[in-house]
């Protein structure tokens, strides 16, 4: 009789594969739930269930049927929000309570909570009338969408109504938030929490060079000052303490100028597009293993608070600004070695414009940190698509 425990993973996308492997390495049988039967994770799981995991009642029945010992989110917000409700019902570890999760994940709730606490976030509004009290330019966002879907920049009041309609249409709940547009560079902060304290953290430079609201190039931060890192870290620790977050990952995108920063989005799921692999290649830290540990009832190992960057790694998501028929990748010369290329489509497939689609992921190792800093913002000019129509930039 097989006494191996079963872990249910709510995601089958390619970026969840490192999580699935980490769960297997920890000794669990993997049961993957997804509404997309052909996703990569459905091919590698021990057991599969074709079900839209946004339906938490259906997920609860699956978990009970298979008597799962652990439940994990993947790289989507929905996987965490659905999972936290099921875990709350079953008493499984790793998730915050549903009300805390909603505060973190839903943009309108987080903005309102953060403003009430005096945290550094853009000024926000939730109605047309309130929005007109803010100063231009503005960003209008759906409160519950992802990957930059439905976001518009408003530079003239005549644009506001259309931007609100775009956000509503992209929102499953038909809700939006309007906020001041903050000038600065985009970064992420990925922190692991243990016993209410941030014990390990990473800072990453992020660039949106194809679609303005979706990251496609990144590396461990070469630009953020030590003082700014400390300020962001202290701010995130205050959130951890205030919300009494459980052990695990807290991942944040923020914008910073030379002397101030603004929190943009927080999440407790694993960031997508193989962010875990970027950290692992750059520092040697088993990011995916650390992420899954609390959901399996385990602790992550003790390490330095800010692990040293040991390799000059850049990550690039190959995407396009107009529909293209994919045939193959092409690469221009760089002072770097291509160390991993992950195709996400097949020859002949029509790749849709970002943020709705991408053709592949590429990891490159630069020869020194100066080259990494200089070249990462420009990777879209070096990693290209070849199409039936001819040679085209990606």
Language-model segment annotations:
Residues 167-175, 180-222, 230-251, 255-263, ...:
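Phosphate-binding core of ATP-grasp and ATP-grasp-like enzymes
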Residues 250, 335-348:
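A structural supersecondary motif
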Residues 296-337:
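A glycine-rich beta-turn/hairpin centered on an aromatic-Pro dipeptide
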Residues 152, 180, 280, 360-367:
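Short, well-ordered beta-strand elements within core beta-sheets of diverse protein domains
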Residues 1-100, 297-301, 311, 320, ...:
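ATP-binding N-terminal substructure of ATP-dependent carboxylate-amine bond-forming enzymes
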Residues 101-177, 183, 194-197, 222-238, ...:
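Active-site nucleotide/adenylate-binding loops and adjacent lid/helix of ATP-dependent enzymes
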Residues 155-156, 191, 318-322, 362-368:
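Short beta-strand-to-loop capping motifs
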Residues 279-293:
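Gly/Ser/Thr-rich active-site loops/lids in small-molecule metabolic enzymes
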């Amino acid at each position: 009789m097989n006494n191996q425990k079963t872990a249910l993973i709510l995601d089958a996308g390619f970026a969840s594969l490192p999580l699935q492997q980490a769960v297997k390495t920890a000794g669990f049988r993997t049961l993957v739930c997804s509404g997309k039967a052909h996703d990569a994770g459905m091919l590698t799981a021990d057991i599969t269930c074709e079900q839209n995991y946004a339906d938490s009642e259906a997920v609860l029945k699956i978990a009970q049927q298979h008597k799962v010992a652990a439940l994990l989110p993947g790289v989507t917000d929905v996987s965490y929000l659905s999972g936290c409700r099921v875990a709350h019902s079953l008493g499984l570890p790793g998730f915050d309570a549903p009300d805390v999760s909603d505060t973190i994940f839903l943009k309108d709730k987080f903005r309102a909570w953060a403003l009430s606490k005096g945290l550094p976030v853009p000024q926000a509004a939730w109605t047309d009338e309130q929005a007109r009290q803010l100063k231009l330019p503005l960003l209008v966002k759906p409160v519950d969408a992802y990957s930059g879907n439905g976001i518009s920049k408003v530079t003239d009041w005549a644009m506001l109504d259309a931007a609100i309609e775009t956000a509503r249409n992209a929102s499953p709940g038909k809700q939006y938030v309007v906020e001041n547009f903050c000038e600065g560079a985009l970064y992420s902060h990925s922190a692991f929490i243990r016993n209410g304290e941030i014990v390990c953290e990473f800072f990453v430079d992020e660039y949106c060079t194809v679609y303005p609201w979706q990251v496609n190039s990144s590396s461990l931060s070469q630009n953020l000052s030590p003082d700014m890192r400390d300020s962001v870290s202290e701010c995130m620790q205050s959130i951890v303490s205030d919300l009494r977050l459980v052990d695990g990952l807290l991942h944040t995108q923020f914008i910073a100028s030379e002397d101030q920063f603004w929190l943009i989005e927080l999440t407790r799921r694993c960031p997508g597009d193989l962010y875990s692999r970027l950290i692992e290649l750059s520092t040697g830290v088993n990011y995916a293993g650390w992420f899954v540990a609390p959901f399996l009832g385990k602790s992550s190992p003790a390490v330095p608070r800010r692990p040293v960057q040991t390799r000059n790694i850049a990550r690039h998501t190959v995407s396009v600004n107009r529909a293209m028929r994919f045939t193959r990748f092409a690469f221009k010369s760089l002072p770097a070695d291509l160390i991993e290329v992950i195709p996400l489509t097949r020859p002949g497939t029509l790749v849709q414009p970002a943020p709705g689609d991408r053709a592949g992921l590429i990891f490159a190792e630069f020869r020194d940190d100066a080259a990494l800093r200089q070249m990462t913002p420009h990777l879209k000019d070096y990693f290209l698509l070849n199409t039936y129509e001819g040679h085209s930039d990606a």
